[in-house]
Amino acid sequence: MEKQNFELQKSLGYHFNIIFINIKKSMEIKLKDYNLTHLQFSILINLYKNNVTTQKELLKYTYGDETSITRLVDRLESKGYLKRVQSPEDKRKKMLLLTEEGVVLTEELITSAKKVNSEITANLSKEESTLLLELLQKIDISM
């Protein structure tokens, strides 16, 4: 039986995985100082930037499940970075809001994330970085 021709090191999946691991490691080093995980950072950034106000909305942005999101939100709330408040429109619904401490922390983390992004793209021109992002978004949409 003839072996199929496939070079792992030339596949997109291989490189996406290696890049993801390296980015995650870089961010985890920065997040370790704050005793946060990358998923907790994702929640904070989405509450800060995307006008997300409920745990259900967070599911769209974090690729988590309800149980894990609840646990992550509980931890962030216990650390004082966010709070649950009753929705003025629907008394059954709880809204998530960053506390003042959560806003300050998230802004510090955004600065750290920008540094990591700069490190990642240090060998690319501005045009290459823009093109790469556009191509990655195109791939993401098609999946």
Label each PLM-derived region with a short phrase.
Residues 1-5, 126-143:
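C-terminal regulatory/oligomerization modules of transcriptional regulators
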Residues 1-34:
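N-terminal leader segment of winged-helix/HTH proteins
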Residues 29, 33, 49, 78, ...:
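Conserved amphipathic alpha-helical interaction elements at protein-protein interfaces in regulatory
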Residues 21, 25-67:
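N-terminal helix-turn-helix DNA-binding core of bacterial DNA-binding proteins
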Residues 18, 22, 48-49, 61, ...:
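Alpha-helical structural segments
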Residues 24, 74-134:
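Charged, amphipathic alpha-helical coiled-coil/dimerization segments
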